Amino acid sequence: MGLYQLFSDIVDYPNFHLSAKVKECIHILSSRKDRAATLLEEFQAFFEETSLNRVQEIFTKTFDLQAECSPYIGYHLFGEGSHRAMFMAGLKESYRMVDLPLTNELPDHLSVILRFLETSSDPEEKEELIYLCLVPALGKMLDGFGGEGDPYQRVLESLLIVIQQDMETKDEKVSPALELQETHHGG
């Protein structure tokens, strides 16, 4: 299973399989020399100390009750309106082209977009979706946390590091995510 699929599962509603997904993601990331694995290890420690019901409550509070941390990427880019609707229609078409099964989630949900990134073989479409949509939306979501108290902040920070490094590796250029990452980590 690839990293984007694992992160997709991690940012989806928590279930009994979450711990295994986080551990697998940490295992894959442990070969990298960055903070991504450490951030997920902190999240894993939280998960192991906390009941599943409590993790689900925190997930709901974080992503469903705070607009700043909404997992709907189109909302962060366009707000509610026709531009978001067009964005979602485009995503649905892209998903259809790679036979990505649609879930009960809207097409601009972070977990669905990550599943698509895992599935798609079109590097230009993936790069466009990452640079123009995912990185700016993740930046807004991270800004919405306002502190270090929410365990899901670590997950999103780890995801941003992974995305930024993957894109740098692919095209050997500094991505906008590097500046965004430095903004959130103080350099």
Set out the residue ranges of the language-model regions.
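Charged, alpha-helix-forming regions
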Residues: 1-110, 115-187
